[in-house]
Amino acid sequence: MEHSLIILLFTVLLLLTTTPGILSQPSPAVAPAPPGPTNVTKILEKAGQFTVFIRLLKSTGVANQLYGQLNNSDNGITIFAPSDSSFTGLKAGTLNSLTDEQQVELIQFHVIPSYVSSSNFQTISNPLRTQAGDSADGHFPLNVTTSGNTVNITSGVTNTTVSGNVYSDGQLAVYQVDKVLLPQQVFDPRPPAPAPAPSVSKSKKKKDDSDSSSDDSPADASFALRNVGSVCDAVSFCVMSVMLAWFYL
């Protein structure tokens, strides 16, 4: 009996000494939830003062394009977001005068299909290619220059500056601009180049020269025959004169 009591006490002591160690072990860390998909319009809504730009992003379908690009590929995107005050600076009726296609081009002109950090502006190559398309002069050129900490942007129609960094995560960069970027293709289209004058082919010119020569040949032959006839008449007259003179003598 005494022996059993000793074993029981020993077991209780063993449990008391090992339990705190078990209880003190940290529970496994819970993995953080993956970040939600990047949504440009939500970022702009959170920043405020981009109501008109958000409305145009949605109405043109560009917002859905950006959502798909950011969440289904590794390609970065840079957006120059004009504030609401930028749109109030436009001439009255400017947006309403645009066709649906031109509105899409206008919004796409504010999107660069690559990530551009603030430090990259100093070394970036001009003209920048936007999602609006051809960056050649007269179409959708966009040029960026820096002067100290100031980033200047020109489209050939609009000159403005970057006034703030709205958002940046290594894949998406959003910068606020002071004016709406107006592309040349929409707001200052160049007249089409005149068609070159039709050139006369060498073969046709040679044929024309040949025809001209052929036309002159009969005239030259006729002139020669007339000259021969005149000479013959003169000779005949002389012969007749000599014969008459000899006859009377």
Curated annotation (Swiss-Prot):
GO-annotated cellular components: plasma membrane; side of membrane
Pfam families: Fasciclin (PF02469)
Topology term for the membrane: Lipid-anchor; GPI-anchor
Subcellular location, record wording: Cell membrane
Glycosylation sites: 39, 71, 143, 152, 159
PROSITE patterns assigned to the protein according to its UniProt record, in alphabetical order: FAS1
Position of the signal peptide: 1-24
Main localization category: membrane
Coiled coil: none
FAS1 domain: residues covered: 37-181
GO biological process, any: plant-type secondary cell wall biogenesis
Family: Belongs to the fasciclin-like AGP family.
Name of the protein described by the UniProt record: Fasciclin-like arabinogalactan protein 12
Organism: Arabidopsis thaliana
